[in-house]
Amino acid sequence: MNIHEYQAKEILRKYGIPTSTGLVVTKTEQINETIDKLNTEVYVVKAQIHAGGRGKAGGVKVVKSKEEAKKIAHDMFGINLVTHQTGPQGQKVKRLYIESGCDILKEYYFSIVFDRSASCITFIASTAGGVDIEEVAKKTPEKIVKFSVDPATGLQDFHMRGIAYELGFKDNQVKQMKEIVKSVYNAFIETDATQIEINPLIVKTDGDLLALDAKITFDENALFKHPNVTAMRDYDEEDPLETRAANAGLSYVKMDGNIGCMVNGAGLAMATMDIIKLYGALPANFLDVGGGADCERIKEAFKIILSDKKVQGVLVNIFGGIMRCDIISEGIIAAAKEIDIKVPLVVRLAGTNVEKGKKILSNSGLEIITAHDLADAANKIVEAIS
């Protein structure tokens, strides 16, 4: 789960990490009053969306007067901001964060993430801050340093010292950086985050360190432990179909293709998407109905898939283990009758009660194309929509 920058900074401040000060705006009528409350010479108006690249897209503006700040805030609120992470459709700006500007001596990058390949927690730091870290990794990888932390032993003093020295800090800045590293680590562990990113972490002209921007992502499986974090969720920033699917116990991710996929199991779902592309088409979604799906969940899955107007055909690929093929077939038929599916539907079944499931489909009287294996299914759905 992602949260907004102003929420991330609120969490960091609770852990003693210095951040820039500001106020959030959720309605246009709050803009003038909010800006009047800020006692500063420089105003920074920031669009709050769950995507990076805001600055390059015009979602971050720096001005030196109240009137300019008010005009820019009014102009920015409600626009559709398109960045390299939002896709061409963009994201509507429904919140602004207006904060005090500050003089910057140097910018750094600092983050903590789960390194799944190494099964450990990893700090990532760079002297090239304020820019896309992926670009730094591609063009100047030598500017990035990593420190891995064994979960069994936890954060040690040598980790904190090492990060501070690698970034070139000296004297009091080393002490400040060690405190930031420790606080970020504690926040990461205690909130069940999967990423905390400060970009940029700056050195001000007075030599002090400050988190100028912040991003935090949380493990959704641990949200039940953190009602205060869950309360920060902004459903306006999430795909409504993905939210609807989650509420139905389905794992759904919308994509850009035209063939809807309904599969049980994440691995099989990814294999299904791969083979659709292999046969010359593109998947419209990732949808895992899970191992315990019933007729109602199957119907809801179809409704979600077909609510995407780009879908020209649907491929159902089920391996019956815990979930029996006859139950799946009954759910498919019930959904087809209720929804009136008007696009080609290809079904491939294997596993528990597969023959029973195929018989139910063949006796249904519906226009359902059956396939005997995955390659046959992909070939048939691609042919059907061509």
UniProtKB/Swiss-Prot annotation:
Cofactor: Mg(2+)
Gene3D superfamilies: ATP-grasp fold, A domain, ATP-grasp fold, B domain, Succinyl-CoA synthetase domains
Gene Ontology BP annotations: succinyl-CoA metabolic process; tricarboxylic acid cycle
Matches recorded under InterPro entries: ATP-grasp, ATP-grasp_succ-CoA_synth-type, ATP_grasp_subdomain_1, Succ-CoA_synthase_bsu_CS, SUCC_ACL_C, Succ_CoA_ligase-like_bsu, Succinyl-CoA_synth-like
EC number(s) given by UniProt: 6.2.1.5
GO cellular component, one term: cytosol
Residues annotated for substrate binding in this entry: 264, 321-323
Functional pathway: Carbohydrate metabolism; tricarboxylic acid cycle; succinate from succinyl-CoA (ligase route): step 1/1
Keyword Zinc: no
SUPFAM superfamilies in UniProt: Glutathione synthetase ATP-binding domain-like, Succinyl-CoA synthetase domains
Keywords: ATP-binding, Ligase, Magnesium, Metal-binding, Nucleotide-binding, Tricarboxylic acid cycle
Subunit (UniProt): Heterotetramer of two alpha and two beta subunits.
HAMAP family: Succ_CoA_beta (MF_00558)
PANTHER family with a match to the protein in the record: SUCCINATE--COA LIGASE [GDP-FORMING] SUBUNIT BETA, MITOCHONDRIAL, SUCCINYL-COA SYNTHETASE BETA CHAIN
Similarity-based family: Belongs to the succinate/malate CoA ligase beta subunit family.
Protein name stated in the entry: Succinate--CoA ligase [ADP-forming] subunit beta
